[in-house]
């Protein structure tokens, strides 16, 4: 009975964050299959140690496991690379006017390419903050750095993104 209760608690507190976990894993690994494998491995690790999880936000705890699993996989493979933006992967399907959709699609591709091109330590904090909307404190817990480091990495990531997006815009401008 205790196992059933723990399984139900795990599903309620951890598995509800699978989308966020996959999103982070996808950005860190750059590949769908690697992200799926990392999330699956992270779920197994999380379940194995779930009874010892106390105090910390279940989402932050699980995302830390996902991040570490991804980093372990990247270290093992030494073949980290980034795919070009793909609508199926990122779900950017627009159904408004064709011209507006084309501009938005182009902007989304530019933004995703710029995020994918960021160094890992900047990419992970920008994804956790801007896409997953986590608090700075939670990001620090996930990444394993102090709050000030999270803030400085976010500032640098935003600055790099802004400069890269402006450079792309200038290259495209007639």
Regions found by a protein language model. Give the residues of each.
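C-terminal edge and immediately downstream basic/flexible tail or linker adjoining helix-turn-helix-like DNA-binding
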Residues: 1-10, 104, 137, 141-144, ...
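A short, charge-rich alpha-helical start-of-domain segment used by transcription regulators
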Residues: 1-23, 33-36
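Acidic, proline/glycine-rich intrinsically disordered inter-domain spacer in sigma factors
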Residues: 12, 80, 88-116
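Residue-level preference for hydrophobic side chains embedded in well-ordered alpha helices
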Residues: 13, 17, 21, 42, ...
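Helix-turn-helix DNA-binding motif, specifically the short coil turn and the N-cap/start of the second
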Residues: 31, 135, 144-149
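Structural recognition of an alpha-helix C-terminal capping motif at a helix-to-coil junction
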Residues: 37-44, 48, 56-68
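Arg/Lys-rich amphipathic alpha helix in sigma70-family domain 2
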Residues: 64-85, 104, 166-167
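A short pre-motif secondary-structure segment
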Residues: 125-129
